[in-house]
């Protein structure tokens, strides 16, 4: 009798899509309030002036201006937004 042994099932073969993390706005770029600057896991970079942090540690601009990266105490990296001066009417 012609029989074929059943093939074994593989336990591999799964993968998840990349999470699209990283810097979205680099130093010197212009941003407006609400623009995402960095998507990260944990606090690789901390929020400086005019930057807020979401519950998933996403850093976003809270004011219009230019993005600036700098080092702070304990060697921590910070990102700030140098706000544009308000135009006089």
Swiss-Prot record:
Keyword set, alphabetical order: Ribonucleoprotein, Ribosomal protein
HAMAP family: Ribosomal_bL27
The protein's name in its UniProt record: Large ribosomal subunit protein bL27
Matches recorded under SUPFAM superfamilies: Ribosomal L27 protein-like
Residue ranges of the region described as Disordered: 1-20
KW Ribosomal protein (keyword) present: yes
GO cellular component terms, semicolon-separated: cytosolic large ribosomal subunit
């Amino acid at each position: 009798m012609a029989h074929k042994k059943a093939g074994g099932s593989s336990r591999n073969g799964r993968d998840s899509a990349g999470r699209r993390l990283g810097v979205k706005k680099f130093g010197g770029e212009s941003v407006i309030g609400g623009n995402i600057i960095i998507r990260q896991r944990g606090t690789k970079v901390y929020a400086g002036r005019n930057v807020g942090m979401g519950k998933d540690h996403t850093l976003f601009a809270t004011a219009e201006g230019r993005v600036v990266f700098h080092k702070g105490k304990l060697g921590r990296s910070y990102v700030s937004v140098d706000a544009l001066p308000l135009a006089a009417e």
